[in-house]
């Protein structure tokens, strides 16, 4: 039976755990993992050092559900249980709230049910410059999506938090789009092979269709852009660019042909 991705591969690539497991790659950064509510209460105050803004994400979820921008109110020393935080849920329609650190940890408690956990990443200040989604068929980019206004987009300067715009449409581009060629080279030639080695995923077991979202990171001294991995999606990757179907068809055919070949008696194989 052919499927786009084996459940084991989905667990390796398609949960927020991948952000922690690949944190030492070039697309990674200051990323932490909380395996329990107690660990969250104990270590989040350290992560929220004065002036730090963080993004916390539940282990599995989509549509911004369980993704929170968190920052301390004021910079007067380490955060404590009673310290105030500004928090904003990435789910569409959410507004910024102010609550204590203890109240926020209590709100996150359901995310730890079963095998649940939370990932903690540094907030990327260049988020207002948009998010780029790379659509891949196995290890080849088949198109791009660019979303100028995405979840957690800030309010205009001087405006109250409630004026922050809601996410806008994603515009699709072919794999030849000139604006994304530097990113394409990084993804195909460096990052996907490194991820495969790190997670022990051979090319034949990569999903037929998957995507990875990138935000712009700090510029290098040379002015070159860097990119930070925001998420990998392996399940229900749709819609996608109109350039993707030929890649999907070719990859699917190759997998089916290989499955048929393996089922033949050894004497009949060529």
Question: Over which residues does each language-model region extend?
Answer:
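Conserved N-proximal alpha/beta basic substrate-recognition cap immediately N-terminal to
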Residues: 1-47, 62
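A structural signal for short, well-ordered beta-strand segments and their strand-loop junctions
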Residues: 2-5, 32-33, 54-57, 69, ...
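Conserved strand-to-helix beginnings and helix N-cap segments that scaffold or border functional pockets
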Residues: 15-16, 131, 242-246
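Short, glycine/charged-enriched secondary-structure capping and boundary segments
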Residues: 17-19, 69-71, 247
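Phosphate-binding site of ATP-dependent enzymes
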Residues: 49-53, 60-65, 69-202, 216-218, ...
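C-terminal active-site "lid" helix and adjoining low-complexity regulatory extension at the edge
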Residues: 178, 182, 186, 200-211, ...
């Amino acid at each position: 039976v052919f499927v786009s991705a084996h459940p084991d591969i989905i667990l390796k690539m398609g949960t927020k755990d991948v952000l922690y497991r690949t944190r030492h790659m070039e697309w990674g950064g200051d990323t932490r993992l909380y395996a329990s509510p107690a660990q969250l209460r104990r270590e989040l105050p350290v992560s929220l050092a004065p002036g730090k803004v963080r993004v916390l994400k539940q282990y599995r979820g989509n549509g911004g559900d369980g993704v929170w921008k968190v920052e301390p109110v004021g910079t007067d020393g380490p955060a404590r249980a009673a310290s105030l935080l500004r928090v904003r849920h990435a789910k569409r329609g959410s507004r910024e709230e102010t609550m204590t650190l203890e109240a926020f940890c209590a709100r996150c408690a359901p995310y730890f049910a079963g095998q649940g956990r939370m990932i903690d990443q540094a907030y990327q200040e260049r988020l207002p410059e948009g998010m780029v989604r790379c659509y891949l068929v196995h290890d080849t980019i088949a198109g791009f999506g660019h979303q100028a206004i995405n979840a957690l987009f800030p309010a205009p300067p001087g405006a109250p938090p409630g004026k922050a715009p809601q996410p806008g449409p994603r515009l699709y581009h072919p794999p030849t789009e000139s604006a994304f060629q530097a990113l394409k080279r990084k993804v195909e030639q460096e990052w996907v092979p490194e991820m495969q080695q790190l997670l022990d995923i051979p090319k034949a077991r990569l999903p037929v269709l998957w995507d990875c979202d990138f935000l712009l990171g700090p510029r290098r001294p040379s002015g070159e852009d860097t990119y930070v991995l925001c998420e990998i999606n392996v399940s229900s990757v749709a819609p996608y660019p109109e350039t993707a179907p030929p890649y999907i068809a070719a990859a699917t055919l190759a997998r089916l042909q290989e499955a048929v070949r393996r089922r033949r008696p050894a004497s009949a194989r060529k």
